[in-house]
């Protein structure tokens, strides 16, 4: 069926009609075409990195203001130094932050404001940042004691606040790095003007430029706050609030203070503010008046005798620690005593502690008591086996932290540091008699600026829960090998764990990952399963700004009673983002009304609604960090009756309920069809439907053709390694970039096949390689296993030819820099007669001219001092190239720096690595002349010959299917009934919906080829027809960055380590080749002892030492005078006082060094020697 579109107006008219339509009337082809258009609309709206941009934009618009407002009014007291102020007339001050404004990124040069773009920061080694200004109010006052009328006020004296001065001004508080393409970035506007300004054509932003380097946030998986965490080792239920990170824990444990025969009874205790309190005492401190009332709040409906005994034992424990706690405020007084007796007691009163730190989302103490009873009931139900414990590996219990949350936490830490410095500085002036200086004199703007820059540079960020700790792995360098690697880095997630401890099941896939996290894209090694990649349709929710509580009441929610007497039997709890906000009588109709209004955009589109029938709860989430994904709503697919062709945006699909964004908890109640085919078989049993199964994969897996036919490990290698190492087109603006190392393919091509993901994304740059004619054959034995043989003529015509651009950077201090140095010690750029290298290509300014051919030993950047000291940068061993560009500039730190880029053309040579898109990585083993290659009847000569043994062991039949499909696509097919009309077929190789083998073979047959892709070929050397047929077809191959020219190592003699006398390791320092344990074991297995002795001894650190055979100790070589009177030098045993039994042995110098080090520690070794 041809593709058909839906008209928006007709769709709205159709919604008014009634009556059900059978989905089979729409047709499978129409529904699949609609899914493709819906996915395209999704990518047009959200793209692939919207989660990075949305999080940062929300932080700039709302989160940054909340950080400053959270500090409230800060009181600054004087230092109370009686030496400075003897009259004790102390002054106080209060500081309050007001409105926060963030400016656009600008750069000032000679007091001139210049336009500042990301490529300026990259070239000038600067940070692409914007200045933060905040309105600060400073109030200076005195406290004076004034007498009052005791009969009117009840006090003899009271303290009167006398205001001395009030100032308001906008000050610079620091600078914040700007995310490229965010609302602060000047390149966020779409259009071709950005490309003219130097912006890359396919740069989507989402990263930062810190001191010239591109940095990206790795999304952090953190445990969700404001949720009940039930654990069975030991039995506890905990609640962690959002603002205050102090956990509130209810523990069910054995009563340690009871007598022995009662030891098995479990009691309920509460861990609150670093102290342990019996739960019954906390109930009465919150306003519960009787034991029956507390039991009704718990409302445990089981008949388990052990739980009943635990509740009774908990009452007895409360009676034991506090007598008469049911009377008056005795329970509250006991709680206050316990809190004040902790090591670090809070400054607030007990009432304030209960209000601020105990369930801060609930305002009254009665509601807090109800929530406490709800926690106790959940714990007891879990202990009785009626409720499951929480799974920490499930994404329902996690939130994704992105740029907004990470920057908010880091800025809060540095702002607190700046506040402490401000307080200490203001205290000194408040104690004196002089006026206070302007507030910018006390608030150091460099604290936030330098703190954020240090966090980005080092990668150490504030821990989410522990104040004094830092975590790593939050920020990473953005990969620029090709656009696909850039997208992978921007969609990566990470779970922070301690590798030394037990990780548990964190590395294994979880059912909650389905459709949100790619189940193949994960690295190997210690990060396996911990570093993940989001799936194509995975979307991270943002914080909802609109209040939904009133709308919940309109949908039938009842208000939570502010008492502890009214029973809640038959009512279902309604939790909004973890806070208990109300009740509902009929949860089924209430949830149905909520979903209906959400599908009509009366409620936030990203709202998640979960109905828990087992626990009688309705959980609603509108917070940020949840992983959502779009699904088709089956009951609304009847609106898609075929109408006139037209296009519509993704928002329209959400507004009319055809699609909806489903969260992890809500999807547990959905019955989702895997595809249109499965849906059409039984449409009545499904509530939702997938757009396509290939969207379950990540961006790197979804573009692999026939991925479902390959071994999972091979797809993992392609998605996690090969596609990120493939040489393509990294950017469209290489002339204004000075990356340390970049690769560019001369003639990148797009493959003949298509996948649904690449077609919906409209990104041909996701493929980095060329289409090569590949033959599966054994050729001269040079393509054993993974080796390949390539056509030399194809390489000479430019196949897989690339260029490598390496930049060398150096910086010097400007002459007018603040760092005072002697003129003869000031390093400057310039040409000097260097002793460390050749300066033939340098000009007088110390830089080479454009087009200069430089090789090993040449000076690439000349630097010297007035005294003649040489600080030049020299090309190391194997480094060479032609000078492409020279950049000289200065940054905002007063330093001049230069960058010289060398270009080197790389044509494939022996040892280079290539890979297909199926994980078939091979090393180029031989370059064969074209006339010696086998050729077909049509005269087609293959570009690459691979060994047939590479397929059974690696289990990649997908490559064979790709070659057969591409062969049919590339060749014209004659239409039936026409002798001259030809057309080209384009077929999709989308994973899980690929064409069948029969369909591919019929396509080859219609094109005039063998059904199974085999070709009759002739020997290029003899011209004879070969007996066996060879499978041949076009296959998309990638050239990897692993090239033999960068890895080949050779040396005869060279530098050795001064301590161990072994060859150094660095290749550029003429280092040796590593001979490790695996190589040693291999030679041992072959019995090549002479070769082993040569490698590990003769060619490494051969040495000799002397041993006394009598005392078996080490003999020294000393100069001594024997009885003859003439001095001689030789080995001598100091223990035996003789040289008669001394022999010479050959040992590695590393062993000799070990003996000497042990001897220096007082450890003597005995050696047994034997004459050979």
UniProtKB/Swiss-Prot annotation:
Binding residues annotated for Mg(2+), in chain numbering: 786
Reactions that this protein is recorded to catalyse: RNA(n) + a ribonucleoside 5'-triphosphate = RNA(n+1) + diphosphate
Keywords tagged on the record: DNA-directed RNA polymerase, Magnesium, Metal-binding, Nucleotidyltransferase, Nucleus, Transcription, Transcription regulation, Transferase, Zinc, Zinc-finger
Organs and tissues of expression: Mostly expressed in seedlings, flowers and roots, present ubiquitously, except in sperm cells.
Keyword Nucleus among record annotations: yes
Zn-finger (C4-type) residues: 1108-1136
Purpose of the protein: DNA-dependent RNA polymerase catalyzes the transcription of DNA into RNA using the four ribonucleoside triphosphates as substrates. Second largest component of RNA polymerases IV and V which mediate short-interfering RNAs (siRNA) accumulation and subsequent RNA-directed DNA methylation-dependent (RdDM) transcriptional gene silencing (TGS) of endogenous repeated sequences, including transposable elements. Proposed to contribute to the polymerase catalytic activity and forms the polymerase active center together with the largest subunit.
Self-association state and partner proteins as the record states: Component of the RNA polymerase IV and V complexes. Interacts with SSH1, NRPD1 and NRPE1.
Family to which this protein belongs: Belongs to the RNA polymerase beta chain family.
Protein name listed in UniProt: DNA-directed RNA polymerases IV and V subunit 2
Gene that this sequence comes from: NRPD2
